Amino acid sequence: MSARSRRLSLLAVLTFLLAAGPAAAQDISINFGQGTGLTERVIQMVALLTVLSLAPSILVMVTSFTRIVVVLSLLRTALGTATAPPNAVMVSLALFLTLFVMGPAFQTAYDTGLRPFSAGEITAEQAFERASQPFRAFMLKNVREKDLVLFSDLSREPRPERPQDISLRILTPAFMISELRRAFEIGFLLFLPFLVIDLVVASVLMSMGMMMLPPVVVSLPFKLIFFVLVDGWTLVAGSLVQSYGS
């Protein structure tokens, strides 16, 4: 490298350092709020992040998602199609059916809780209490009394006089148990016609001496065409929605 090139390189470096010096010397400040409100805002932020991380679990616990996704899973098992429809399709269908069933509850929670809280009209505690009311009413409408009594006894808490005063730590697991029971009841009814098809196909194969041919392979097309002819997806989706009185 020539002496002239070295001088030009040194001049460029010095120019860069002189230009970057004032920028590097500027103070960097972050506004965390005024006075004692910092701790409260940090706690609110942590609580918000926690709620967002638990949102899928909350969706499963307090909505109709549990019953719907279990019924769809049992339906796929009854049909004998291990991977069709795939899990992503089943979960997506269950999610949108849940949004359809829970639409009024979500709208009420937003109008009475989230919107006033966003406008600064109510506190976070008031917003949670108002937003949880429609979901509490939904769970009370669909929970079994036997399951409520079970978890009330396990908690060893005095039973409230009004159903609206039942704690969520009692109501939520009782509701989930009730949903699983109803999902299995619906699944049993879905299994019956496909079980009959399997038995008929197995009997025909045995009478023809074709015992080496798996009956499941032969019965699968018959179960699929039967499900299509009776418009099975419409019946299942409609029955699931109507089971909530919608």
Give short role names for the model-derived ranges.
Residues 1-25:
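N-terminal secretory/membrane targeting signals
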